[in-house]
Amino acid sequence: MKKIWLIVLAVTGLLILTVAGFVVRDGATVTPVGEGTITLEAGTFEAFPLPQFAAKHISEDYKSYFVEVEPGIKVHVLEVGSGFPVFVQHGNPTSGFLYRKVAEELPKDRVRLIMPTMVGLGFSSKVPASSHTVANHMRWINTVLNQLQLSELVYSGQDWGGPVGMGALSLSPGLIKGAVMLNTGFGAPTRAANLSIPHAVVKIPLLGELLLEVFFPIFDGMGRLQGDPDQYTADVAELYGKPVVDSGNAKAPLAMMRMVPDGPDHPSSPAMRAVANYVESLDIPAEIVWGMRDPILALGLPGMKRFFPDAPVTETQGGHFLQEEVPAEIAVALLRVVDQVQASRGDSQ
């Protein structure tokens, strides 16, 4: 009998190790495939017809296409409008669709809104968890901007879209002419510190995978980060979550949470410090629009003011994904900055 129990325990242990190994696997590269092409001033790109569950959220005048930033790694880009380029960068775990309501508030004849989706999220390529680094994401988004042959732009970013967007621009420092900063942050902690309790918990190996990928999928809980949780509907959860889950590689949300530096020696810290130094060097028209009901980054407003001490600040009742809740306030700020940029060069319309 004792021998039987030992065999049972051994088999059980082997099964547990097998399951654990599967859960914490690095994940594979998943390359999406488009259909046809789309021609822009910068050249011809691979078109990506949107599935109905996503297409229903935007108007028919949007362009949807891929920019291949490395062999097998494609960034999905949405854009709408014509006029002065405005590059907007989302963060974790959303996609370029996060700015769709902002787009509705902007005059399409004055602004060309460019909305890339970070690798690993939305309809962009999925990559192994180990490939999610600040430096990689900066380089990938910078490659998008370069392939679109942009010579100037106004920028806005939120969550990881702050460091990644500004980081991408730091690699082509002449591009940015103005900015509207949303809930995000720059730099790295000078001592051990976690951004939030969830960030501290999910960085624990295996526990993070079990929590975010098995028991409590991150896309189902995003409403808790909003000023009005009821605005985060099942349709919106599907918009952000379905492309990631259906791809077979849903590693990005957890990997991006683990990218957040928790001290000066974190792997992300050198890149984050470099981005902060770049932001400090900027002398551009800027505004800040902040969601004061953001449970993660609301308290980061004073820090953002230090980077842009002369920027007008609009405090809102939005939560973490404030683009979903206060798009009009963001759009108005973007237009004011675009007007300032154009006026400064003498071509205000």
Language-model features: locations:
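C-terminal-most transmembrane helix of multi-pass membrane proteins
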Residues: 86, 331-333, 337, 345
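Alpha/beta-hydrolase-fold serine-hydrolase catalytic core, especially in secreted/extracellular enzymes
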Residues: 342-349
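Short acidic-hydrophobic surface loop/beta-edge motif
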Residues: 65-70
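N-terminal Sec-pathway targeting helices
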Residues: 1-14
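Short hydrophobic "strand-cap" motifs at the C-terminus of beta-strands
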Residues: 89-90, 289, 318-319
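Catalytic histidine-centered segment of alpha/beta-hydrolase-like enzymes
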Residues: 319-331
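Conserved HGGG/HGGXW glycine-rich cap/lid loop of the alpha/beta-hydrolase fold
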Residues: 73, 78-123
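Flexible "cap/lid" subdomain of the alpha/beta-hydrolase fold that forms the substrate-access gate
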Residues: 15-64, 75, 98, 121-156, ...
